[in-house]
């Protein structure tokens, strides 16, 4: 946390608001559905339904850590092939459960993240 605070303090010198761009990347690539990632030649493992609440909570924990470090805002990145984007896009979300299919269903994971 001290190193993050030092980064945040550098932003304090100017008049710009401090924010952190949040992305969660793990060692094992996971996605909305199993298959090759459209943005790289990586094969991703589709997240199981029971894993989704913990993943959404991880976003929430990251936001709390950023707040503790003194950031004013957090960007939830939901584009360009990142995890939330994979749930939103019919090209990467081939799920057959309540997280796939209609736009409302594909938005369900993003809604979980925002609630955290």
List the model feature ranges, each with a label.
Residues 1-2, 74-76:
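Hydrophobic faces of well-ordered beta-strands that scaffold small-molecule active sites
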Residues 1, 88-116:
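Alpha-helix-loop-beta-strand connector modules within alpha/beta enzyme cores
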Residues 47-50, 54-57, 82, 105-112:
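Conserved active-site and cofactor/substrate-binding residues in soluble primary-metabolism enzymes
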Residues 65-72, 112-116:
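A structural motif corresponding to the C-terminal end of an alpha-helix
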Residues 4-7, 78-82:
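Glycine-rich beta-alpha junction loops
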Residues 1-65, 69:
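Non-globular sequence segments
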Residues 14, 85, 97:
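An active-site metal/cofactor-coordinating segment within enzyme catalytic domains
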Residues 76-77, 85-89:
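Non-cysteine beta-strand/loop elements that form the S-adenosyl-L-methionine
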């Amino acid at each position: 946390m001290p190193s993050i605070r030092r980064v945040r303090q550098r932003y304090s010198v100017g008049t710009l608001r401090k924010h952190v761009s949040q992305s969660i990347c793990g060692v094992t690539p996971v996605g909305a559905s199993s298959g090759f990632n459209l943005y790289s030649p990586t094969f991703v493992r589709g997240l199981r339904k029971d894993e989704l609440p913990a993943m959404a909570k991880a976003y929430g924990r990251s936001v709390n850590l950023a707040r503790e470090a003194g950031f004013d805002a957090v960007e939830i990145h939901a584009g360009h092939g990142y995890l939330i984007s994979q749930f939103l896009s019919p090209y990467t979300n081939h799920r057959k459960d309540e997280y796939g299919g209609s736009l409302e269903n594909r938005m369900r994971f993003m809604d979980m993240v925002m609630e955290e």
